[in-house]
């Protein structure tokens, strides 16, 4: 797959990145280099290789999945200018 200037501009637009005409050429080259590397990765034979999440053999610590309120509501609103029943009070912004 090859990236052309139109694709570079479209990607920049989708990413909300301003790209000048001078930057399009170098970006096109960089994106094509990235895609070429990804194509090389696709050629690697991974048959029989187990998926892994880390390069070191470690287990994730597990804990019980318990729902609670955190017990810190009063600490959280302690520095708020105005509160009521552990809720932040803010000025009305919509009529």
Curated annotation (Swiss-Prot):
EC numbers for this chain: 6.3.5.-
GO molecular function: asparaginyl-tRNA synthase (glutamine-hydrolyzing) activity; ATP binding; glutaminyl-tRNA synthase (glutamine-hydrolyzing) activity
Keyword match ATP-binding: yes
Gene name per UniProt: gatC
Protein name (record): Aspartyl/glutamyl-tRNA(Asn/Gln) amidotransferase subunit C
Gene Ontology terms describing biological process: glutaminyl-tRNAGln biosynthesis via transamidation; regulation of translational fidelity; translation
Subunit-level organization: Heterotrimer of A, B and C subunits.
Keyword set, alphabetical order: ATP-binding, Ligase, Nucleotide-binding, Protein biosynthesis
Highest taxon in the source lineage: Bacteria
Keyword rRNA-binding applies: no
NCBIfam families: gatC
Family assignment from sequence similarity: Belongs to the GatC family.
Function: Allows the formation of correctly charged Asn-tRNA(Asn) or Gln-tRNA(Gln) through the transamidation of misacylated Asp-tRNA(Asn) or Glu-tRNA(Gln) in organisms which lack either or both of asparaginyl-tRNA or glutaminyl-tRNA synthetases. The reaction takes place in the presence of glutamine and ATP through an activated phospho-Asp-tRNA(Asn) or phospho-Glu-tRNA(Gln).
A Pfam family hit: GatC
Catalytic activity: L-glutamyl-tRNA(Gln) + L-glutamine + ATP + H2O = L-glutaminyl-tRNA(Gln) + L-glutamate + ADP + phosphate + H(+); L-aspartyl-tRNA(Asn) + L-glutamine + ATP + H2O = L-asparaginyl-tRNA(Asn) + L-glutamate + ADP + phosphate + 2 H(+)
């Amino acid at each position: 797959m090859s990236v052309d200037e139109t694709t570079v501009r479209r990607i920049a637009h989708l990413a909300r990145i301003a790209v000048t005409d001078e930057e399009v050429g170098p970006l096109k080259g960089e994106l094509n280099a990235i895609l070429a590397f990804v194509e090389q990765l696709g050629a690697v034979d991974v048959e029989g290789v187990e998926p892994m999440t880390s390069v070191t053999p470690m287990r994730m610590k597990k804990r019980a999945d318990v729902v609670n309120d955190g017990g810190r509501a009063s600490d959280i609103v302690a520095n708020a200018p105005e509160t009521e029943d552990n809720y932040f009070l803010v000025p009305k912004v919509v009529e």
